[in-house]
Structures are given as structure tokens and as C-alpha cells.
């Protein structure tokens, strides 16, 4: 199709749907029934899995969204991983413009649709929801079944709303 670039070394299942514009990098894998709606960059070695839907996204190299994920209007950093069924919610339920909330500050985006921004090496647990405008710092873990909003600092473990701890050095 038009405006679709797929690296020769990438693997795309015959049942995957890809709409342009889209770039799929070297050694990336687009699995069975993946649904790429367009405006997507899938980095080198990234995995877009079974029944995962992408729209208006940048997936940096080695990102994994391997099982039943929705990632819309979002940026996922190097080697970030979203567990099965985790999603980026990109529209507020009251349909107002998305704001990013960080350390008591409110940053207006001017956007009706904005998902999440994940730093490098973020691990999102299964079944988690990243609410519109969520920003997660590098090297952070999100526990399964979490509903995350606002800013989560780099090097954290997000256990639940109001319970975020700093990772211990290894």
C-alpha cells in the first residue's frame, strides 16, 4: 500500500492489517491480527503482537506491545514493554483537552487526544490503564491492574494510586 515502508528483515504476519503512513524497522515483528491504523513508527526489533492496535504512535527500538494492547497517540521509549491487555487511554471521559500533571503543575497540551509517554525501559504490568496525558520516567515498573495518571518519576515502582516507591540500587 501507499506510504508503508517495511524493512526487508521485518516479519509481518499475513493476517496483520497495516494502514499508512507507517514505517516498520529492521527485525521488527508484527504478529497475527495486529491492527496498525496509520501514523505509526515501529522501531528496530520491536514487537507488535496478537490483536494489538496502534494509532499515531512512535515505538522506539525493541519496544514490546505483544498481547492485546491498545496504544494510541503515544510514545514508547527504548525497550519499554506493555504487559498483556494493558492500554493507553487517549481521550478523557468528559472529552475536555488533555493536561499533563507533574509535581503540582498542570501543562495544557491543547490536544483532545493524547495517550502516554513512556521513558526507556518502562515495564507496564498486565491489565493496566495509562490514562490520557500520563508520563512515566525511565526504568520504572507499573504493577499489574494499575490505573495510572499524571507523572511517575524515573526509577520508580508504581504499586497503586498514592503508593509509588523508589527502586533500590542493584
Residue ranges and their predicted role:
Residues 1-35, 39:
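Extended, small-residue-rich solenoid/repeat segments and analogous flexible loops
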Residues 3-5, 23, 41, 75, ...:
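Residue-level "contact hotspot" at macromolecular interaction interfaces
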Residues 12-14, 25, 44-50, 88-89, ...:
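Short, functional N-terminal and low-complexity linear motifs
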Residues 25-26, 31, 44, 55, ...:
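The repeat-register position in solenoid repeat domains
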Residues 31, 37, 41-43, 49, ...:
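Transmembrane beta-barrel architecture of outer membranes
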Residues 50-51, 56-62, 66-170:
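Glycine-rich hexapeptide-repeat left-handed beta-helix
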Amino acid at each position: 500500500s501507499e506510504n508503508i515502508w517495511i524493512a526487508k528483515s521485518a516479519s509481518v504476519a499475513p493476517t496483520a492489517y497495516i494502514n499508512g503512513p507507517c514505517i516498520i524497522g529492521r527485525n521488527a515483528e508484527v504478529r497475527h491480527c495486529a491492527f496498525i491504523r496509520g501514523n505509526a513508527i515501529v522501531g528496530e526489533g520491536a514487537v507488535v503482537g496478537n490483536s494489538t492496535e496502534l494509532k499515531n504512535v512512535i515505538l522506539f527500538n525493541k519496544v514490546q506491545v505483544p498481547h492485546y494492547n491498545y496504544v494510541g497517540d503515544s510514545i514508547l521509549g527504548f525497550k519499554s514493554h506493555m504487559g498483556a491487555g494493558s492500554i493507553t487511554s487517549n481521550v478523557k471521559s468528559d472529552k475536555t483537552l488533555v493536561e499533563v500533571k507533574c509535581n503540582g503543575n498542570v501543562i495544557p497540551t491543547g490536544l483532545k487526544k493524547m495517550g502516554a509517554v513512556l521513558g526507556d525501559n518502562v515495564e507496564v504490568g498486565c491489565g493496566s490503564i495509562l490514562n490520557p496525558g500520563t508520563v512515566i520516567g525511565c526504568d520504572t515498573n507499573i504493577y499489574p491492574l494499575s490505573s495510572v495518571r499524571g507523572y511517575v518519576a524515573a526509577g520508580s515502582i508504581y504499586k497503586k494510586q498514592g503508593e509509588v516507591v523508589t527502586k533500590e540500587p542493584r
